[in-house]
Curated annotation (Swiss-Prot):
The keyword Ion transport does not apply. Residues 39-52, 112-144, 188-226, 278-280, 326-343, 388-397 are cytoplasmic. This is Lysophospholipid transporter LplT. Keywords: Cell inner membrane, Cell membrane, Lipid transport, Membrane, Transmembrane, Transmembrane helix, Transport. It is a multi-pass membrane protein.
Length: 397
């Protein structure tokens, strides 16, 4: 059955506004919860190497449910899927508030996030299309990064004041996202009537993976976004250990302020990409990807706060300019071949596999005692080389 698409000529339709608000609140909760839970781990004297494990159980949920969440997004009204997923996040955050093991509660939030992601991006192609899709992605990324900016800072600052207050604020944000989802129009399911046999769903997902991987443009997008988000998540945890070593600051708030600089930069970069890059000129974003690694390397050598702020903002600008066109390319090509929901689910599998791999290597490096500054230098150099290799491969094919 072909995918039905519902579009609106206005980029600021009622439905689009509801999606952006819901995304902001949901992402605010995600980022505040991460830093609030990290503060909880520190307060309960968990070892340093366990910090990235928290994110690994989160992304593990993405990987485990990857064969199924794309079909869920395409089989039901995407706004309702988003509401259900935010309800799961609310339950996970509340469980941590009430003393449940933080790794278990955070895993439940990860399950909600896994269900949420294909729906939140897939719905953009139903509310708008064509040239407005890149701009809609820019709005989505800007909303997400604004939420990362405010959520990260709120999580760290509130945790320095009282950890339980920080956790409760996360639960309230998820509750607000559930309410915002109610105002998203109930669009027709994109691909109703598909089989719910788990074996068939897994086979269908693997077929979608194969289809997207065989297409040069979507393979290029999948690899690029996977490298970017894997590196981005690893950088967040690198900052938590880098700040006390390089700057001599031991509070919970400073790493969140530094993460906020990345967030501000990504908003700027996403806006620039929406104006300067189209689906036909996606390769313009590649030099920015290479420079991300170079700037991370330079950043790792800093010992003063102001240069660190400036370099992290530059990393964000480069990151926003790099990732927004790649997201739009995958959605547009994927919608026509395997369905937007399935395309985003495959993208999530790639991105979260990269996160799991990079976080695992980072956690292992910390566990065996490699100093955080050499870890940062190696991380930046390897990322720059990886994006360079991807660009060379893309130009040849």
């Amino acid at each position: 059955m072909s995918e039905s698409v519902h579009t609106n000529t206005s980029l600021w339709s009622k439905g689009m506004k509801a999606v952006i608000v819901a995304q902001f609140l949901s992402a605010f909760g995600d980022n505040a919860l991460l830093f609030a839970t990290l503060a909880l781990l520190k307060a309960q004297f968990y070892p340093e190497w366990s910090q990235p494990i928290l994110q690994m159980v989160f992304v593990g949920a993405y990987i485990l449910f990857a064969p199924f969440v794309g079909q869920v997004a395409d089989s039901f009204a995407k706004g309702r899927v988003m509401m259900f997923a935010n309800g799961l996040k609310l339950l996970g955050a509340a469980s941590i508030c009430f003393g449940i093991n933080p790794f278990l509660g955070y895993t439940l939030v990860g399950v909600g996030a896994a269900a949420y992601s294909p729906a939140k991006y897939g719905i953009l192609g139903e509310l708008t299309t064509g040239s407005k899709l890149v701009k809609a992605n820019g709005l989505m990324e800007a909303s997400t990064i604004a939420a990362i900016l405010l959520g990260s800072v709120a999580g760290g600052v509130l945790a320095d004041w009282h950890i339980l207050v920080a956790l409760a604020a996360c639960a309230l944000a998820y509750g607000g996202a559930v309410v915002a989802n109610i105002y998203i129009p109930k669009l027709a399911a994109a691909r109703p009537g598909q089989s719910w046999n788990l074996i068939s769903m897994t086979r269908s997902f693997l077929n979608a993976c194969t289809s997207l991987w065989r297409n040069g443009e979507t393979r290029f997008s999948l690899v690029g976004t996977s490298l970017f988000w894997g590196a981005g998540v690893t950088l967040r945890f690198l900052l938590v250990l880098w700040v006390p070593v390089a700057l001599g600051i031991t509070d919970n708030a400073t790493p969140t302020y530094l993460n906020a600089m990345v967030a501000i930069g990504i908003v700027v970069g996403a806006g620039a990409a929406a104006k300067l890059v189209t689906l036909e000129t996606v390769s313009r974003c590649m030099p920015a990807g290479i420079l991300i690694g170079v700037v991370v390397l330079i950043f790792s050598l800093q010992h003063e706060l102001l240069p660190a702020y400036a370099l992290l903002m530059l990393i964000g600008v480069l990151g926003g300019f790099f990732v927004v066109p790649l997201n739009a390319l995958l959605q547009e090509r994927g919608k026509k071949s395997v369905g937007a929901g399935n395309a985003i689910a495959v993208q999530n599998l790639g991105e979260n596999s990269a996160m799991l791999l990079m976080l695992g290597i980072y956690s292992l490096a910390v566990m065996v005692g490699i100093p955080v500054v050499p870890i940062g230098i190696g991380f930046g150099a390897l990322f720059a080389l990886a994006i360079t290799a991807l660009w060379i491969w893309q130009r040849r094919h």
